[in-house]
C-alpha cells in the first residue's frame, strides 16, 4: 500500500514537502481541500492551473489518506472514524507551516472545512464549492437526504468507511453529465469515505457541541465566495444559499454564485476548468 509516513503532528512527508516547496517559492499558497469520496489527486488539474497563474498549490489529505484510488479501494478501513474536527485540526496544522496566509479552496465537506479554517482567521481568501452545511444551516432538501442515505440509513456506518455504488455516485455526484462520463469519473476518482462526518452534519443543529460549526462573525475570516452547481443533488442551492446568508453577516466580502447546469462533480468533470477559473478570478482579487 502506498501511503506517506506521518510525523508526530500527523503531517505526512508529502504534505511537509508541499509546505516547504510553497515557502521556498515565495508565492502565495493555495490550499485545496477535498471532500468525501475523493482524494487530494482530484485537485491535480486545479493545482496546475493555479500554479500557471503564479500561485503555489498545497493539497493536504485527510488523516491517513492513501495516495492513490487503487490503494484506497484496496484498504478502505483507513478512512473509518475520521471526524470533521480531526480533519479540520489536521488542515490547521498544515496551514500553520506556511509562511504566507494561503487562499483556501474546498469542495463539499472540503468546502465546509475551508469555511472552518477561514473562521479561525487562517485564510487570506476562501472559495467554498458545493459546501456541506454547518450548524445554523437549516434547509434539508429531499435530494440531499437521498444523496446521504447510503451512509445515514445505518447508524453503524458512523464508525465505518462507506463506498458508493455506481448508481449512488451517479445520483450524488454525476447526475449532470453523460452516462459515459459518469462511469469514467466513478472509476477514476471515487473512493470509500468515513461515515462520521455525514452523521455529524445531520445532527449539527441538535448538538451545541458539534464539530460541524463555523465562526461566521470573525472579522479575520477574509473574503468568501460560495459556488454551487445548479443541478447539485448533494448540496442543492437551498443549502448553499442558507450558508451564504449566515456568512454574509461577516464584515468581509461575501459572495455566492450558481454554476449553471452543473452537478456535485463540477470540480472533477469535463467542465472543471470553468469552475476553476471562476475561483481563480475571485482569489486574484484578494491574494
Enumerate the language-model features and the residues they cover.
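Short, surface-exposed "cap/lid" segments of acyl-processing enzymes
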Residues: 23-69
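Short beta-strand/loop motif that positions the catalytic acidic residue
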Residues: 220, 226-228, 232
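Conserved alpha/beta-hydrolase "acid-adjacent" motif
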Residues: 233-242
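Gly/Ala-rich beta-loop-alpha elbow adjacent to hydrolase catalytic centers
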Residues: 105-110, 114
Amino acid at each position: 500500500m502506498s501511503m506517506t509516513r506521518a510525523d508526530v503532528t500527523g503531517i505526512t512527508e508529502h504534505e511537509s514537502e508541499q509546505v516547504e516547496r510553497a515557502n521556498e517559492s515565495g508565492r502565495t499558497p493555495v490550499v485545496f481541500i477535498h471532500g468525501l469520496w475523493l482524494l487530494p489527486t482530484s485537485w491535480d488539474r486545479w493545482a496546475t492551473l493555479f500554479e500557471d497563474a503564479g500561485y503555489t498549490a498545497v493539497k493536504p489529505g485527510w488523516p491517513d489518506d492513501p495516495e492513490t484510488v487503487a490503494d484506497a479501494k484496496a484498504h478502505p478501513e483507513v478512512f473509518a472514524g475520521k471526524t470533521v474536527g480531526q480533519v479540520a485540526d489536521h488542515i490547521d496544522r498544515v496551514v500553520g507551516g506556511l509562511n504566507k496566509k494561503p487562499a483556501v479552496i474546498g469542495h463539499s465537506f472540503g468546502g465546509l472545512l475551508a469555511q472552518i479554517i477561514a473562521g479561525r482567521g487562517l485564510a487570506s481568501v476562501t472559495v467554498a464549492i458545493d459546501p456541506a452545511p454547518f450548524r445554523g444551516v437549516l434547509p434539508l432538501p429531499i435530494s440531499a437526504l437521498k444523496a446521504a442515505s447510503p451512509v445515514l440509513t445505518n447508524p453503524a456506518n458512523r464508525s465505518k468507511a462507506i463506498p458508493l455504488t455506481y448508481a449512488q455516485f451517479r445520483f450524488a455526484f454525476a447526475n449532470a453529465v453523460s452516462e459515459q462520463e459518469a462511469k469514467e469519473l466513478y472509476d477514476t476518482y471515487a473512493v470509500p469515505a468515513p461515515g462520521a462526518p455525514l452523521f455529524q452534519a445531520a445532527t449539527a443543529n441538535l448538538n451545541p457541541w458539534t464539530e460541524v460549526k463555523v465562526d461566521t462573525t470573525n472579522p479575520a475570516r477574509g473574503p468568501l465566495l460560495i459556488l454551487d452547481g445548479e443541478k447539485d443533488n448533494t448540496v442543492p442551492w437551498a443549502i448553499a444559499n442558507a450558508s451564504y446568508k449566515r456568512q454574509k453577516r461577516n464584515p468581509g466580502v461575501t459572495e455566492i454564485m450558481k454554476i449553471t447546469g452543473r452537478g456535485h462533480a463540477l470540480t472533477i468533470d469535463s467542465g472543471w476548468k470553468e469552475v476553476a477559473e471562476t475561483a481563480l478570478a475571485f482569489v486574484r482579487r484578494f491574494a
